[in-house]
Amino acid sequence: MFYYVYVLKSVNYNRLYIGFAVDLNKRIKEHNCGLSFSTKPYLPWQIIFFEAYKNERDAKRREKYLKTSQGGRLLKRMLKEYFYNNKSNSHCLA
């Protein structure tokens, strides 16, 4: 069994959401069905990043860290580098 830390991006708003889940697909569906108070106003959501952990405690610790200001800066830097690198390599897919 894996435990997941994930990042959702609102399709219509400039918002990110960081969460924890045991069943990642089910949890994303719950977000997009409006079943989460925190994400309901910013529907729909798409997953842009996730990490899998074998240990629940490690996953929850990572989620908590990414929600701090320091963790948020790290996450934004990682995402920026990832999307920049994939954008600059998109010509390789043609």
Model-derived features: positions:
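GIY-YIG nuclease catalytic motif and its immediate N-terminal context
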Residues: M1-L43, I47-F50, D58-T68, G72, ...
